[in-house]
């Protein structure tokens, strides 16, 4: 089944998705629920720009948090944390700058951090939330 990328970017529910995309969406839902239970208010999900994307954007107290969600069913090849490369960090930072210049403009005065939520193993395994996992420097 082909993915309707435009519908997916616009957040239209029910957009055709591959099994991998559906699994990714489920993982992001798990991550968002975990963060919400820890007091994070989710402001945005799945925002795309040329050169990058944001899985989740939230407020944790007064801190603006850009969250990368990484899933791995199997710990081979280093697990979910090992998949956060320098290039991936660069793309998340680029997308955060884009978001702050547009949709998130009203939050541009807030301090920011880059977090990662790791989902490893079966769906019953609790997520691991790495706060301040990397910097924009």
Curated annotation (Swiss-Prot):
Q: Which Pfam families match?
A: UPF0102
| Source taxon at top rank | Bacteria
In this UniProt entry, which cysteines form S-S bonds? none
Q: Where is this region: Disordered?
A: 1-23
Query: In Gene Ontology terms, what is one molecular function of this protein?
Result: nucleic acid binding
Q: Which NCBIfam families match?
A: PRK12497.1-3 (NF009150), YraN family protein (TIGR00252)
Q: Which family does it belong to?
A: Belongs to the UPF0102 family.
What protein name does the entry list? UPF0102 protein azo0871
What is the originating organism of this protein?
Azoarcus sp. (strain BH72)
């Amino acid at each position: 089944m082909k993915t309707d990328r435009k519908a997916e970017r616009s957040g239209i529910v029910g957009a055709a998705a591959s099994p991998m995309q559906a699994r990714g969406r489920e993982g992001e839902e798990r991550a968002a629920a975990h963060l919400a239970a820890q007091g994070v208010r989710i402001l945005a999900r799945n925002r795309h720009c040329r050169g990058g994307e944001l899985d989740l954007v939230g407020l944790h107290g007064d801190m603006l948090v850009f969250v990368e969600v990484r899933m791995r069913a199997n710990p081979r090849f280093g697990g979910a944390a090992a998949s956060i490369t320098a290039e991936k960090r660069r793309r998340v930072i680029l997308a955060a700058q884009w978001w702050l210049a547009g949709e998130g403009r009203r939050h541009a005065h807030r301090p920011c951090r880059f977090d990662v939520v790791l989902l490893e193993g079966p769906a019953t395994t609790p997520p691991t939330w790495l706060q301040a996992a990397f910097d924009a420097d």
